[in-house]
């Protein structure tokens, strides 16, 4: 028995890989960001971010320093591209390039969720990514440790750890 072959590529093989449709929670964040005139794709809470990461619908990138990740804790399986380094938080001039390179290594294009301590540095990082032409880069509001409470302490009010989401510490 013989099989017919063709030298023309199939439509699926010829077409570039399209990113999957944004999950509804990210579509909502994007619409809200556009309505507010934010210079990046928008923000999601840790409780919104975790299911997306868990289901393989988004890539979680921790933008804190290596020291913060080591001594304060980190989300298992999260990628790392430092927005800044050292105790002076010296800005990483290669941040957007490093984030783009990390994203390009993924087997399929995914939205990126940036996580820092409180959601402030990750918002700046998302803005920088947008300026560099990266789309669908979102901030995780509240961050890993959360906002300050009335006593100026973190971790008692909101944030990744406060909600009991997965994390590990060296």
Report the location of each language-model feature.
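Short, surface-exposed ligand- or partner-binding patches at beta-edge/loop junctions that are enriched
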Residues: 114-115
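Rhodanese-like catalytic fold shared by cysteine-dependent sulfurtransferases
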Residues: 2-58, 67-111, 122-170
């Amino acid at each position: 028995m013989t099989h017919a072959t063709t030298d023309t590529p199939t439509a699926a093989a010829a077409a570039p890989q399209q990113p999957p449709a944004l999950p509804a929670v990210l579509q909502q964040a994007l619409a809200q960001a556009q309505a507010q005139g934010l210079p990046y794709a928008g923000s999601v809470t840790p409780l919104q971010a975790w299911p997306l990461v868990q289901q393989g619908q988004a890539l979680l990138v921790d933008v804190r320093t290596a020291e913060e990740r080591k001594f304060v804790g980190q989300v298992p399986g999260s990628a790392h591209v430092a927005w800044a380094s050292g105790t002076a938080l010296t800005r990483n001039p290669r941040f957007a390039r490093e984030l783009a390179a990390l994203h390009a290594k993924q087997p399929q294009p995914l939205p990126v969720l940036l996580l820092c301590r409180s959601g402030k540095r990750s918002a700046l990082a998302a803005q920088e990514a947008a300026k560099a032409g990266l789309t669908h880069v979102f901030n995780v509001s509240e961050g890993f440790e959360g906002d300050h409470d009335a006593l100026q302490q973190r971790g008692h009010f909101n944030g990744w750890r406060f909600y009991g989401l997965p994390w590990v510490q060296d």
